[in-house]
Amino acid sequence: MAHTLAQKILQKHTDQQVGEAGQIVRCRVSMALANDITAPLAIKSFRAMGAGKVFDKDRVALVMDHFTPQKDIDSAIQVKNTREFAAQMGITHYYEGGEAGVEHALLPELGLVGPGDIVVGADSHTCTYGGLGAFATGLGSTDVAGAMALGETWFKVPPSIRVSYRGTMPAHVGAKDLVLQLIGHIGVDGALYKALEFDGPVVDAMSVEGRMTIANMAIEAGGKCGLFPSDDLTLAYTAARGRNDEKLSADQDAVYERSLSFDVSDLAPQIACPHLPENVRPVTEVQGVQIHQAVIGSCTNGRISDLREAAAVLRGRKVHKSVRCIVLPATPGIWKQALREGLIETFMDAGCIVGPATCGPCLGGHMGILADGERAIATTNRNFRGRMGSLESEVYLSNPSVAAASAVAGEIADPRGL
C-alpha cells in the first residue's frame, strides 16, 4: 500500500507491516530525550522497572534547560540527580551549563536528530524535529523510561492530514504565522493524535529553521507529530552537522484523512490571543493592546533566523520604557553566532535584557514571570492561563518581528507600520 510520510518512517523502524491508521506497532527508537523537569520522573520509573542500563548510551539525551541556570534548591536537586544518573549510565549526550541549550534547538544543531529518525521525548514539543523529517513525538516520562531501557516503544499508526501552502510570503510574515493560522483554522484539537504533513511551494522554499517552527507547534493542534519531507535543504542542514541522510517523502498516492490548502500571499502577521493558541487574529485586529513584557526566544523562535528578524526591527530603536524585552538565544551556538553578527549589541543598544540559553519564562519558570494584570507578547508556543506567571496575566503569541515591534511601541504593533 502507498504510505504517508508518518507510515513510511514507522515502517523503517519496525519488523511489522505498517498498515492503516489505528494499527499498533512496536518501533525501534533513534533517540530518547528528557529534560531537567521530566528526567527525574523518567529515572524514577527506570529504576522501578529494574533496568540496569540504558539501551544505548549514545542514543539517550538529557538536556538541562527548563529551570536552568538552577533557579532554586529544588531545581538544583533535580539537575544534580539527573547528572549523577547520566554519569552512572555513561550517557554521552548529557548537557548542562555552558554546553546546554533549549533541547529542541540543541539536538538539531548537534546533528543528533534527522530525517527518518524516530525520536521520543519527555516533552510535548519533541515534535519540533519533524521539521527535519523525523517522526518525533512527546511521551510521558514513564514511556520514555521504557524507551531508554529497551530502545523501542509502541505507537498507534496516526492518520495524516495534508497541509499545503502556496503563494508568496509577504513582508514580516513567517513560519510562525503559518502555523498560527492553521491552529486558528482547525482548533487545538483539530489534529488530535494525527500526523500533520506539510508540503507545497512555500514549504519547498522555506528554511529548515522555519520548518522546525511549524513542526514545533503541531502539538498545539493536538497533533501526534508534524512532518516535512526531507529535501536538498534538509540534507544540506544535516550534512553540515556531520550526518549522512537520505531524502524521504510521502508516496504520491498516499491516502490522507483530510487535505487543507492555504494561499499565504495576503496573510498578515498572526496573533494568538489569551488563553488558547487557537484564538488567532490578524495583528491589525489586536494592535494597540498594552503590553508589559516581550519575550523573544524558546524552542519555537529562538534560532538565529528569528534573532535576525527581531534585530532588524529593533536596530536603531529603543524598547518602550514600560516594557521588559527579554531575548534568550536558544543555544550557546546561536548566542555566539548572534554575537558575531552584532545582534547582541543591537539588542543591548535597544534596551533589551539578553539572557542565557534557557526555556525560562516560556513555562513560567523564571527570568520573566508575569504579575497580576500584566500582559506579554512572546514568540513562544503556549498562552494558557497562568502559563507565564500569574493566573491573572495574559500572553499573546506572535512572530519575532511583531514581538520586537511591540516592545518598541509598548503595545501590540504591526511591524509593517514602523
UniProtKB/Swiss-Prot annotation:
Binds 1 [4Fe-4S] cluster per subunit. GO terms for biological process: L-leucine biosynthetic process. Its cofactor is [4Fe-4S] cluster. InterPro entries: Acnase/IPM_dHydase_lsu_aba_1/3, Acoase/IPM_deHydtase_lsu_aba, Aconitase_4Fe-4S_BS, Aconitase_4Fe-4S_dom, HAcnase/IPMdehydase_lsu_prok, Homoacnase/IPMdehydase_lsu, IPM_dehydratase_rel_enz, IPMI_cat. PROSITE patterns: ACONITASE_1, ACONITASE_2. SUPFAM superfamilies: Aconitase iron-sulfur domain. [4Fe-4S] cluster binds at C299, C359, C362. It catalyses: (2R,3S)-3-isopropylmalate = (2S)-2-isopropylmalate. Disulfide bonds: none annotated. It holds the Pfam family Aconitase. It comes from the Bacteria. The keyword Membrane does not apply. GO terms for molecular function: 3-isopropylmalate dehydratase activity; 4 iron, 4 sulfur cluster binding; metal ion binding. Gene3D superfamilies: Aconitase, domain 3. Signal peptide: none annotated. Pathway: Amino-acid biosynthesis; L-leucine biosynthesis; L-leucine from 3-methyl-2-oxobutanoate: step 2/4. Its EC number is 4.2.1.33. Keywords: 4Fe-4S, Amino-acid biosynthesis, Branched-chain amino acid biosynthesis, Iron, Iron-sulfur, Leucine biosynthesis, Lyase, Metal-binding. Heterodimer of LeuC and LeuD. HAMAP family: LeuC_type2. NCBIfam families: hacA_fam, IPMI_arch, LEU2, PRK00402.1. PANTHER family: 3-ISOPROPYLMALATE DEHYDRATASE LARGE SUBUNIT 2, HOMOACONITASE, MITOCHONDRIAL-RELATED. Catalyzes the isomerization between 2-isopropylmalate and 3-isopropylmalate, via the formation of 2-isopropylmaleate. Belongs to the aconitase/IPM isomerase family. LeuC type 2 subfamily. This is 3-isopropylmalate dehydratase large subunit. It comes from Oleidesulfovibrio alaskensis (strain ATCC BAA-1058 / DSM 17464 / G20) (Desulfovibrio alaskensis).
